[in-house]
């Protein structure tokens, strides 16, 4: 890789790592709504560590409980990249919700579907052709199931609804 990783401690026990006194913030890159990612989140927050993730599935399914746990331990829980990674929509929504009554949320929740549907409408091409084109251009994953079946958009919508309206979706 060209990067010397020898100075860094490697662990295979997430619980122990989250409890280490020399760890202030835990960054989760595991993925999945349950299992190791959730175990790590709970362990880090229980230990009062800051926790950062872009894991939209975990935040959609367990975000409210994790937020309560974080508040009890006065530990930061950050997940801005879980929704519209390049746009600070979570921060904006939190700040807007604190000062205003939010009535609606509009937006494109899934870029893959937006590309496919827009191209289908403009060119008349069929879904399969546009999905392959999206994959070739890097807009769609090799396994686009979560995108084209709406799971990705549902996760994002659940997060936005929880922040904007206090709703469990």
Language-model features: where?
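Electropositive phosphate-/nucleotide-binding environments in soluble metabolic enzymes
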Residues: 11, 20, 35-38, 60, ...
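Active-site-lining helix/loop region of Rossmann-like oxidoreductase modules
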Residues: 99-169
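General beta-strand structural signal in soluble alpha/beta enzymes
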Residues: 11-12, 19, 27-28, 52-54, ...
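Rossmann-fold NAD(P)-binding glycine/threonine-rich loop
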Residues: 32-47, 54-95
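N-terminal glycine-/serine-/threonine-rich beta1-alpha1-beta2 phosphate-ribose binding loop
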Residues: 1-46
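A glycine- and small-aliphatic-rich helix-loop capping segment at beta-alpha/alpha-beta transitions
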Residues: 49, 71-73, 94-100, 121-126
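Short coil/turn connectors at secondary-structure junctions
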Residues: 5-6, 21-24, 47-48, 72-75, ...
């Amino acid at each position: 890789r060209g990067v010397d990783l020898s100075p860094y401690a490697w662990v295979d026990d997430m619980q122990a790592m989250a409890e280490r006194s020399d760890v202030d913030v835990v960054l989760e890159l595991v993925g999945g709504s349950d299992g190791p990612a959730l175990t790590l989140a709970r362990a880090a927050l229980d230990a009062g560590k800051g926790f950062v993730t872009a894991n939209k599935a975990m935040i959609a399914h367990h975000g409210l409980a994790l937020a309560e746990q974080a508040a009890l331990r006065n530990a930061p829980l950050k997940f801005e990249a879980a929704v519209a990674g390049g746009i600070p929509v979570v921060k904006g929504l939190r700040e807007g919700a604190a000062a205003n009554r939010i009535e609606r949320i509009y937006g494109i929740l899934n870029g893959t579907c937006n590309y496919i549907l827009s191209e289908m409408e403009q060119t008349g091409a069929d879904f399969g052709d546009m999905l392959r084109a999206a994959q070739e251009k890097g807009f769609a994953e090799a396994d686009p199931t979560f995108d084209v079946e709406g799971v990705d958009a549902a996760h994002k919508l659940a997060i936005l609804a929880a922040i904007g309206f206090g709703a469990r979706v």
